[in-house]
Design a protein with these regions (language model features):
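Non-catalytic, mobile gating and regulatory segments of ester bond hydrolases
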Residues: 1-230
Length: 230
């Protein structure tokens, strides 16, 4: 069976892929990180390695060695998808492809971009990449329910990037997608260093969350369906 597994951004949740997965022509699994959204009462991850190990354990219950596996990740989720892809291949799973959205390769990300002195700086960062209104950022709901997981994810992302040294290239197809107005991602061609195959790159109009725009959603769904059907 063909299965697409989706990983959200820092502080994100499975619902962020709601529009995207409606038209996908295969079985879809949307990961929900511990301590996020529907799993709010569970403990947050201590590190990226902790997150990846936990995802591996969960996926073993949902996929088989006979399945054709495709991994999709947005922003931090793209890094998780890439690391999981390597781990799954090493464990004997049939990983066919990665769809990496809005994320440069780890050696091109500056960990100092995630040096936040306080929560106000995190809010400014979110407003810059997502144009999130102040009414949301300053709400009690955001402060109590969303900010803790965002703060933690940005911390583990910073630590992961700062310590990253691997140059292992994955042996599966990689499709990179990002938006030309994304303030965090200039280009994604650097992923070629991490692939044993020729990568594909696609650029769209929009910001860091470009795949939420209907026109982009339709194009991405069409692209993924074509890739999966090959």
């Amino acid at each position: 069976m063909k299965k697409l597994i989706c990983f959200p951004c820092a502080g994100g949740n499975a619902k962020s892929f709601e529009k995207l997965i409606r038209g996908i022509h295969c079985f879809v699994i949307c990961a929900e990180y511990s301590g996020h959204w529907s799993r709010y009462e569970e403990p947050l991850y201590h590190s990226m390695e902790d997150c990846i190990q936990y995802q591996m354990q969960e996926l073993r219950e949902k996929i088989t060695l006979q399945d054709e596996i495709f991994l999709l990740g947005h922003s931090m989720g793209a890094l998780i998808a890439f690391e999981l892809g390597k781990n799954l291949l090493n464990a004997g799973y049939n990983v066919k492809g990665l769809y990496l959205l809005a994320c440069m390769p780890p050696d091109e990300i500056n960990d100092t971009d995630f040096n936040f002195e306080d929560d106000e700086e995190i809010k400014l960062f979110l407003k810059r990449i997502n144009q999130m209104p102040g009414s949301v950022l300053n709400s009690d709901f955001f402060r109590e329910n969303l900010l803790p997981s965002i703060r933690n994810d940005l911390r583990i992302l910073k630590n992961f990037i700062g310590a990253y040294s691997s140059r292992e290239a994955i042996d599966c197809n990689i499709v990179c997608m990002c938006a030309v107005q994304d303030p965090l991602v200039n280009e994604m061609c650097g992923w070629q260093r991490y692939s044993q195959r020729k990568i594909k790159e696609y650029y769209y109009q929009g910001n860091h969350f470009f795949f939420h725009e209907q026109e982009n959603t339709e194009k991405i769904v069409e692209l993924i369906n074509l890739e999966i059907s090959d």
